[in-house]
């Protein structure tokens, strides 16, 4: 998937105040009564008022072909709220709305369009507050405390539907086939789209559309829908409705990256850091019963225990998967943290990454050539760095205006407290020694002869993840590092943004008048003892990068305040999130994968055993989206990521890539 900045909608508002597309010469909604038309065509055409109370699942999934102003979504959300108020004991508790938009409105145009419908204001304001920046791919918005999920896919729907992960197949309960009229936008109304709609529709799923065009009806019938005409809204004579009355065979293009969930809703999580905390919250929101086992006497004593950590994306012109994942993970993280109902020290002050030498300058120049939205990243010249950061560096760079810093330790502790209020059970000082299958469950053996049995297990215990027989062959490694805590000075107190160079320096935390500077890097080490060498090196790297800056030379590390931790990392800098792969079975079953791709079956994994690991140094950026991805996978719900990027997070990816090329695979 090519990475590019999405072009915003080119529109104007007519005399009635209705938005009109200049490119397609068509209105976004009816000049007469767009709200009532939406209720009639899409809610009525899919019989949602009748289906909601009878729905046999806790989640109802709606997909839409053109988001536009969000009128259909807001109207549905309003109706869903009214349903929940009238039927609080119904099986259906959550709404998932998936929509595609090639030319998203700007936030300003969106707000202007929403003024048409004052009765939708309570819902429209929440949508506007989380409106994503124009990046391609999926933007997941968690609304109404997680009861409503909106997946906004920015890009061409005919391209995007071919790039969706198999987790979306046969998941859609109702389709809203909307968009500009077929005569105005023929490129959207294709057989390719109709086939994708059929593939994604659940057996018994429905569709509705405002048009009655013959080629649309015939195309949907060819795809597998049973179609019928219905009286149109207002002056329109007819519209179309359909139902998927059959179960279509599903294609599988890359079985080696298949993801399996679990029919069970009870899980144990092994860990105690940010990954465990955020995954607990995501599973609880989906109705899981969750137990957390932490080896330490308190949470966040491992890699998640730092006072300050920087939040900004990891970008690379030469690695599309890394680029796509981290840009969308970053924007999701900001939305997630902003709406999280817990307190934690943070400041979205911005992050500036500086080119202190020729190599770093070249890397930044490559990042800036990717046509990124200004909301995500902008170039900053050397003479402007002092103005935006508060300190002189004599370097140019790239600024992430929505980045900043937060306290990982406080975040982790308070998220776990919130999760406990929602039913999470936590056991501290439970060191997992081994785990094994027993009667379709997992038997967990802890130090001190403690045992527990759980239906599903998630390993989220950082660098200790490879200590079990099921995970000992994973290609992950430990990285020990030391962060120095330095007292502020009059010059350092002027620092307004996080600085990244051959290290990083945070603005002072008002809670303690200290900065964090770091971090040392010792690959393969798990040593957490204080190191005076590391303390001095943290200071020296700052001086070496900014040799003309007097403020850098005045950094004082003499009080020996520091924190040492160990991270878990991978060679490709991407997390490992998904099923725990079975190494031995993979080598056997995929021995001839390079020659027999067409005969491949799903990759071997351990049943009901999952992992959430290798967050490296960017866990604050990646953990929220990874938690959402894994919780969705475990619950057999739509995953907010395209197939190729999701494959790059699969724990078996490094083995499979070699096997596909006919190369030998080694453990670790």
Swiss-Prot record:
Residues 270-668 are annotated as: FAD-dependent cmnm(5)s(2)U34 oxidoreductase. It is found in: Cytoplasm. Keywords: Cytoplasm, FAD, Flavoprotein, Methyltransferase, Multifunctional enzyme, Oxidoreductase, S-adenosyl-L-methionine, Transferase, tRNA processing. It comes from the Bacteria. GO terms for molecular function: flavin adenine dinucleotide binding; oxidoreductase activity, acting on the CH-NH group of donors; tRNA (5-methylaminomethyl-2-thiouridylate)(34)-methyltransferase activity. It catalyses: 5-aminomethyl-2-thiouridine(34) in tRNA + S-adenosyl-L-methionine = 5-methylaminomethyl-2-thiouridine(34) in tRNA + S-adenosyl-L-homocysteine + H(+). Its cofactor is FAD. One of its GO terms (cellular component) is cytoplasm. Residues 1-245 are annotated as: tRNA (mnm(5)s(2)U34)-methyltransferase. Its EC number is 2.1.1.61, 1.5.-.-. HAMAP family: MnmC. In the N-terminal section; belongs to the methyltransferase superfamily. tRNA (mnm(5)s(2)U34)-methyltransferase family. Catalyzes the last two steps in the biosynthesis of 5-methylaminomethyl-2-thiouridine (mnm(5)s(2)U) at the wobble position (U34) in tRNA. Catalyzes the FAD-dependent demodification of cmnm(5)s(2)U34 to nm(5)s(2)U34, followed by the transfer of a methyl group from S-adenosyl-L-methionine to nm(5)s(2)U34, to form mnm(5)s(2)U34. PANTHER family: SARCOSINE DEHYDROGENASE-RELATED, TRNA 5-METHYLAMINOMETHYL-2-THIOURIDINE BIOSYNTHESIS BIFUNCTIONAL PROTEIN MNMC. This is tRNA 5-methylaminomethyl-2-thiouridine biosynthesis bifunctional protein MnmC. It comes from Escherichia coli O9:H4 (strain HS).
